[in-house]
C-alpha cells in the first residue's frame, strides 16, 4: 500500500476551526465548510484530534481540509473524538444536495467498490483501470496477479444510508440551502 504525505501551507493550526459567524456571513467559506462536513459525516469520521481539520488562511479562498482520515467507514470505535462524524452546520450547498440526490446505489458500488487496481507483471506492479469487484465483502482483495482496493459492500451501504439521511433531513427542512 502507499502512503502520501503533503504539507499544507497557509492553514490554521490548532483550536476550533469552525467559525459560526463566518459561516453565516461568508458564502464561500460556508460552501467549503459544509461540503467538508458532509464528507466527514458520510465517511463516519472518528478522529477529531486537533489538527485533523484545517482551514485556509487565504481570505479569498477559505478552503477546508480534512487530513488523517484513517479512522473512518467501518473502523473500530476510537477515543480520538468524533464531533465531525455528525452534520454540525445548518446550511448546505444546494448544488451538493442536488448531486447527492442524483447518485444511484449502482454508481456508488461501481465507483467505491474498486477505487484502485494493480497488476503484477514481469516483476513490476502497475496501476490499471478497475475491473469487476473480486470480492465485495473485503476492502483489500487479491486474485492471481491482481490486487484491488475499495470499500466493502457493507461500507458502501453505510455511505448510501448516510446520503439518504441527509436528503431526508433536507426534505424535512432541517437545512437551509444556499
Residue spans of the language-model regions?
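Phosphate/dinucleotide-binding and metal-coordinating scaffold of catalytic cores
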Residues: 1-178
